[in-house]
Amino acid sequence: MDNQQDKVIAASANGDNNLINGVKNNDSEDQEVAMKSFVALEATTPIQPIPVIQKESPMFPRGLLPPPSKKPCMQSPPSPLALIEAPDHSANSASVNAISLTSGVAKGLNTWSLPNECEKAPFAIMEPAGMSALNGDCLMQPSRTCLGCFMESKEAVDPEPGISLKVSDLNRDYETCAVSDIGIQCINAGENIKYGEQLLSDQLLGFPLHKSRAGDRRESEKPDIDLEDPTQKSYYEALLLDKCNTEEALLANSNQDWGYFETFISESKIELLDLCSKNELSVNLFSEEDVENYMFDDDESTLGSDVCSLKIRYESFQDNVRDKTTLLMQEDAQFNFFPSVFTTCPKRESKSGILKQSSDLSQFKVPDVSIIWGEEDKNLDKKKGKEEVHEDKSIETKDEKDNGEKPALNNKPCGGLEVEQFKNLKADQLTNSLETSGNFSDDSSFIEVSYDAMGEIKDCSRYMARDTNSGSSSSQQNYGLRAKRKVRYSEDYLYDVDSLEGEKVNERKEWPPGGSKEEDDDEWCPKKRRKVTRKEPPVIIKYIIINRFKGEKNMLVKLSKVDASETTVNLSENQLSKYAKLSPLKGFWQKKKKQKNSNTDSVKTPLCQKQSFEPGSFEVSFLPPARKRKSKLGNRHRIQRIQSVETSASSKQVSFCSDQKQACNRKEDGVKGTPKSALLTDPSCANGSHLRGLIVSDSVKVKAQDTEFKGPERKVLNKIKFKSEARLKSKKIKAGQENKPVVQMSPVSEDTSSKANLKNEVTPGTSNSSHMSEFHETKVKNSTFLPTTCSSEMPLSSANVATNIPVIPGGYLQTLLDASDLSNNTSISYFTNHSAEQNEGSLTQTEKAFVPLQSAQDCVLSSSSDSQLQQSSQNFKMEASNFGSLWPDKDTSGSQEFMTEVSREIATNQSSEFEASQVVSMENNLTAITYSPVCLNSDASGCNKVLYASLQDSHLPPEDLYQLCHFNNGEICFPFQQGPLSTDDDGRLFSFDSMTSLTVSSSNYCSLSLKSCEKDGDDEINDDFLAHCSPKLVIQQSIDEIAPLKESTDLLDISNFTPDKFRHSSLLEMSPPDTPSLSPQSTRCESIKTLGTMKGFQEGVPGSLSTVEKIKWDCNTLSQQAQADDGFTLNSHQFQFHMFNDEDSVGLLQKSPCLSTFDEPAGQINTNSKVSKSRKKTSPGKSGAVSQSSSQKNSRKKSPKASNKGVEKPPSKTSRQVPKSTKKGKYVAAVNGEKMQIGIGHSGGQPNSTSSNAKTLTECIQHGGPVASMKIPSQKGLSGDWALGKESRPGWNDMSVVTNTNNLLDDDQREFQEPSYILSNIASGMADVQRFMMASMEPLWEPMEHQGESNTFYSPDSNSLKLKTLKILAGTPQESKKKVTNGSSGATKNHRSVKAVSKSNGKAAIGEPGHADMPGSSEDSRSAFFDKKYSNVNTLGNNGPTHKKLYRHKSSSKGLRDEKYKGKRVEREQAHKDEAGTTSFEKLRDSNYNLLKAETAFGVLPVFEEETHIFQKDI
């Protein structure tokens, strides 16, 4: 040992590494000694170190190794002696260190365990490097772990004062001394424990006292080493050597030892691998991973001095890897917990340890680990960073070679165990030094101190910080990521190490001898690169895939029609044709356009061209989607919308081929057969034109006016959606037709305008039809959305497209939905059934209904066109509103005609804006209802009912009759009768709605696009991106949020169940209210009916003209309801109520004659839509009427609770719907100024409207139409509508009002409950939704059945799961629209209603029962019931979209309102009924239906109340 020490001194004198304070003197010597000692160690260690290491190996990994190592070391002391002697003989501290590292690891650990004994502890302290012990343990962590951590561990764990002093001194020295000093000391101490400790004292501790202590300890430990500690001494030497010598001895003999080490590595790869866990070689083998793993290796320094020194080398070479020090710490903990990983970890640790040693000089500086680990830092700090690191590398390499060789020799006999032990010792010392020091008394403390030194010792932390600063300085902080990466990489690396490590170790050996860590880095880098190659695919891929589907324009195609079972497809002409049909390309659509142009009239041809043009994604339709590639939904909207326009433009198209053709033939035949057939035969041959022509010539005129009026509003919306296109088209169309501003706006508008003109001309003659055709042609040319105009021509291409390619505009989910054939089959069957049902009424009606149905279906299929058609729908809405204004002149027939036109127009327009156009159509129908009780109600209700029930003509008329009965005339039934005629339109519309449900299911975004365009496309575009995925969601959102489909971000959730979709407010409003929705049809019908029915009930009050004004006007209309004429105008505005999205439309509608009573209030409210919403909340007390209106709404909300009558259930629906409205209102405040205006028009605008409603309620109650007035305020929100309806009921049922108020409160609470409600809906799944739908569908259907025409409205399919699903999907959009409309008013109502509930209760109770109790209440009941019915439908629609909420939160405004409404509705429902929301909905629907029946019973207020009582009981 003295010789070794002398040699170490000589080596220090030689100072291979002069830069290293101690190592420069001792490095060469130490390395030589280490080499020789390593050789000797190999010779001796194989004998004894095997048992020692064997005993220790299990203990090291466990951290218990040191104590057993003690005894084994004590048993193997001779071998440590021999090892030490061999180092002495070899006079190489490197050899001694290596030997000590191998056999001395156990002994060193035992010595460290012995440091519990004063002798061993003094020795270890004396050798703070404990070079033999330290090297043994510290080859893995020679410098930083062994010295600093070992000393520190001794200090902490070992009560021995010497250790504590030396640990403190070491810490001080580490702070003072460079790692090189420690390395020299470690080398010297390892080589000669005495001199090594002197070096430790001098260099590590930085003062000779430590050397004296080291001498004393050497002397004391020398006997220990000779006696019991020789092995331990050798271990200390090995550790110290490993620390200092691996760092500096290796640095001293970097070339020599490294070359030898390389040779040795090549000779014994596996052993070297094992040794590598402890040796520099392990650093080479595991440097990269270990560096990564132990770059943060404050603890790693504890793992092994040799590893630490090696790591120092690599860390100084790989400063960038030091950030893994923290990972090393983490791995230390892992190793401590998982000793089995030690073998792998020591390697990583040795790599990381050395890297960390060099990087984290700090750890070696504070603890030995800080010195070795921070050696690079210190070296960098002391200008020895690289040189020392190189030296360290070389010395460590040498030392590791020596150690690796001897341990390899030792590993050969005991290398596996010893090297494993040594690895584990390193790992343990690095990671399990706590355990090692704990078992060893010093080692446990050592690792603890290592951790403490890392964490607690400011020097360690500082050095760690230094390491972080120096490059691997982020030792602790980055371990989280690094840990995963390292561990994973370590594993990979281990795998590579076993297979590639020999080669790479050789390369690394060769490279480290080069001494540049950069070489090591290069070598490490390959592994890192290798690891990099193992990167997992980014999660973004799914989004890419989804976006890809989203962007697919041809996603309109029903992919479901493709047989997925066909693994291989023979692309025969038939197949290609099939696929071309399924997925029409540009050429296909161009061909289609050409075919349409050639097969259809000139007007048809332009429309078809446009439609084909756009669906072909060739020009407008496809190119805009291409332009909007980012917003692929928007593209789809455009494409589908155009297709929808095409479809809607052609009833045949809507019918998909046969249906469309049949409908078109029927239409043409029926239209021609009709006096207006000539006109319809003209360009007006479009579905809407034929139907309209069939229906009414007065209606044509009214519709022309309505179209005119609607055109500007629609223009506004179209400008919003497609400003350039819509404006150009509008301008061109406008220039072409003064009477058809809507037509100018968009194909739907064109269609509507042209149809209106055609109808207007139909009565006058065919000249107007030709003019319409010409203008329509012009429109087709000018308007991108032209296809809507040519319904007849459109059917061909649409029929081909629909038949060949049931276009699912919804995108991928839409395709999936279509694949389920829900939307496609349902649409087709619904359209067909509905056409058949509607055909019951009359051939013309049937044709009309059938054609519109087909148009609707095709429109729905063409959701992309719907986006474009949204403009048309908006314009059409405006037209409808205009017609509503003009409508009063032509009350019934004009209304029917208009209704038919509207239905036709909607058929076309609905294709243009599935939701919006449907809503517009519905609204137009509502307008028609308002305008013409039969037609409008038939159209709106029929549309809704067709939507809901796939309805038969009888089903549509009942609602139409109901609506018409409610508001068209004092006699409610009479308008209901006209429902069947309108039902054809409605049937068509329903077909469209069904198709909308289906297509909405397949192309929710399309419907959303329609709705957005119609209402607040721009505002809710953001919420619309997922619409295509979530049909129900889309339907609710389609009016408000179709444009957001452009946002493909949310669409990336194909599942549509990600909270991503809910992050928008739509999350809250969307799901709970939507899930139970009866069906898209019911919801849509409900929206339209609620708008139209409420408005219609309120009887086309001018308030219906504009959403806000509709309410006011509806109030007037209630008064005017007896005056069917004024009521119809208001109904036109009611249609505009749906047009609430179009503030301009609303404003325009307000301009209608119906504005007479509420025009100013509506204007005010529209103007103050957002303010009015707040004012709505506050205005309930503003005026009795407002309070009453609020009360009505609140009553409707509360009625479920307060009322024990049937009214209570509808109020429950109202309350249910109110949350949606409220949420929607909330969102409307932000998103829909006009919506809010509308809501305000209904609610806030009801200071006038409500006062008017109070009056109108009173008057209408007197006149039998007050319900409409009450409904109109209710219409502010869905709940508002219901509130009015329920207000009507409270008129005859005060408890209803109270219950509504309670439900309103429940509504507000339900918002908060809706997440669970959504979850319950989700949990219940479609079962709940279906249950709700069935409850809503059947009750809606039954009451309609009760009314006889209600049956017509609710076809048997309405209860069918498919139809229910469609209702959920398709009903949501109108619900959303209505909810959006009512959302503003609904939120206002919810707030205002709460205030006005008492007032409303008193007023409604007073006014309604006081006024024509039977007739007024009857109408009110009907209105309320119908509203409730629609509200329930809406509620169900809202509930239905629970999955919509799941699907998407694009409809944040609508969705949130809807969800809130759903939640609130459920809350109210539960509050008023403590029953399952489903049952409540069912009963509420039943009560609504019973109320409707009672209403259908005209003035039978008692009956209605009885019904109410019955259903309240049910509730």
UniProtKB/Swiss-Prot annotation:
* Signal sequence segment: none
Q: Which GO terms describe its biological process?
A: negative regulation of cell adhesion mediated by integrin; negative regulation of cell-cell adhesion mediated by cadherin; negative regulation of cell-matrix adhesion; negative regulation of neuron migration; nervous system development
Task: Write out the biased-composition intervals (Polar residues).
Answer: 746-757, 763-772
Q: Which InterPro entries does its entry note?
A: DUF4683 (IPR032757), Nexmif (IPR042794)
- Keyword line: Cytoplasm, Developmental protein, Neurogenesis, Nucleus, Transcription, Transcription regulation
Q: Where in the cell is it found?
A: Nucleus; Cytoplasm
Q: Which Pfam families match?
A: DUF4683 (PF15735)
Residue ranges with Low complexity bias = 1180-1193
Tell me if Thylakoid is a UniProt keyword of this record: no
According to the record, the residues making up region (Disordered) are: 381-415, 505-529, 731-774, 1158-1225, 1372-1422, 1435-1479
Coiled-coil residue spans: none
Expressed, tissue-wise, as follows:
Expressed in the brain, particularly during the late embryonic and perinatal stages of development. In the developing brain, it is expressed only in the cortical plate and subplate region but not in the intermediate or ventricular zone.
Using the UniProt record, give the first listed, main subcellular location.
Answer: nucleus
Biased-composition ranges, Basic and acidic residues, are 381-405, 1455-1479
A GO CC annotation recorded here is: nucleoplasm
Q: Where is the composition biased (Basic residues)?
A: 1442-1452
Source organism's superkingdom? Eukaryota
Main role? Involved in neurite outgrowth by regulating cell-cell adhesion via the N-cadherin signaling pathway. May act by regulating expression of protein-coding genes, such as N-cadherins and integrin beta-1 (ITGB1).
Name of the molecule in the record: Neurite extension and migration factor
Supply the source organism's classification. Eukaryota, Metazoa, Chordata, Craniata, Vertebrata
Q: Write the gene name.
A: Nexmif
